[in-house]
Each structure stands twice: as C-alpha cells, then as structure tokens.
From Swiss-Prot:
It is a multi-pass membrane protein. This is PRA1 family protein 2. Keywords: Endosome, Membrane, Protein transport, Transmembrane, Transmembrane helix, Transport. It is found in: Endosome membrane. The chain crosses the membrane at residues 42-62, 65-85, 97-119, 123-140. It comes from Mus musculus. GO terms for cellular component: endosome membrane; GABA-ergic synapse; glutamatergic synapse; postsynapse; presynapse. Residues 63-64, 120-122 are extracellular.
Length: 178
C-alpha cells in the first residue's frame, strides 16, 4: 500500500465556476447518486477540506470551546460507529447499505449531546452546515473525465488519500471508483 497523500487543490473554475457542470441527481437511481457523491468526495477532497477548515476556524474564533467540544463529540461518535461496525456484523451491514442514515445518526447523536451542554448552535454552524453543503455540492456536481481517471487510480490502490481512508472506514470502499 502506498503512502497517504492529499491530492492537489482543484481550480476554482473546476470546483464551482465556469467549467463546473451542475445537475440535480436522479432520485429514482440512488446507486448512481451514491457513486456520484463518493467520486466527487474523492476528487474534490482538498477543496472540501479547505472549506470545512475555514468554517471550523471561523466558528472556533467566535466560540472556541463549543467548537472544540463539537469536533470532539463528532470524532468520538464516528469512532464508536467504526468500532461497532468492526465488532458487530449487523452494524457493519447497516453501515454499508445505509451510509447516509449512519452519518445522519452520528450527527443527530452529536447534536443531542451538544444540545444537553448548550453547544448545539455552534455544532449546527461549525460542523453540520459545512457537511451539508459539501454533500450538496458532491450531489449536484457532474463528474468529468479527469475526475473519473483520478478515482480509478484511487480505487485500484495506486494512490491513497484521507477521504479514501474515511470512506473505507465508513464502509464505502467498494463504491469508490465505480
């Protein structure tokens, strides 16, 4: 296995401006929609990481303790999901067949915990909103040839990226590159 590397930052023109082609996904074909989202998450991961980082930095500047607590709760909740999927077959099957529901459950549990300690608004602003916008962009952005080639390289294991490892931990490794 090769080392984990962050792919290059994609041009703003490719990401959201001129050459970016957006279209609503077909809700009648959820498998194709899932492939589009996963492949866009892999291809634009550096751009998404930058957007998420800016959002976290802004929220951290405004409410540092709640932002840190929000990030910690989400990391722990994701860790529990990965651990449960590794030790229990039923959770593993659920994680593979319903990844959106698992992500929603992690975010809902995190929101409930943070609501109890008074940090729900910061959580919604610093974590949930950027995740929603990233998933919205990944759902709407049509793939181009360069995107497909990069995803094939990732899927055959010639190149490892942080998003590829995260998707693998969430049980979506078989979807990537399709």
């Amino acid at each position: 296995m090769s080392e984990v590397r962050l792919p290059p930052l994609r041009a703003l023109d490719d990401f959201v401006l001129g050459s970016a082609r957006l279209a609503a996904p077909d809700p009648g074909d959820p498998q194709r929609w899932c492939h589009r989202v996963i492949n866009n998450l892999l291809y634009y991961q550096t751009n998404y990481l930058l957007c998420f980082g800016i959002s976290l930095a802004l929220a951290g500047y405004i409410r540092p303790l709640h932002t840190l607590l929000s990030a910690l709760v989400v990391v722990v909740a994701l860790g529990v999901l990965v651990w449960a999927a590794e030790t229990r077959a039923a959770v593993r099957r659920c994680r593979r067949s319903h990844p959106a529901a698992c992500l929603a459950a992690v975010l809902a549990i995190s929101l409930f915990i943070l609501w109890a300690v008074g940090g729900a608004f910061t959580f919604l602003l610093s974590i949930t909103a950027p995740v929603f916008l990233i998933l919205l962009h990944a759902s709407l952005r049509l793939r181009n040839l360069k995107n497909k080639i990069e995803n094939k390289i990732e899927s055959i294991g010639l190149k490892r990226t942080p998003m590829g490892l995260l998707l693998e931990a969430l049980g979506q490794e078989q979807e990537a590159g399709s």
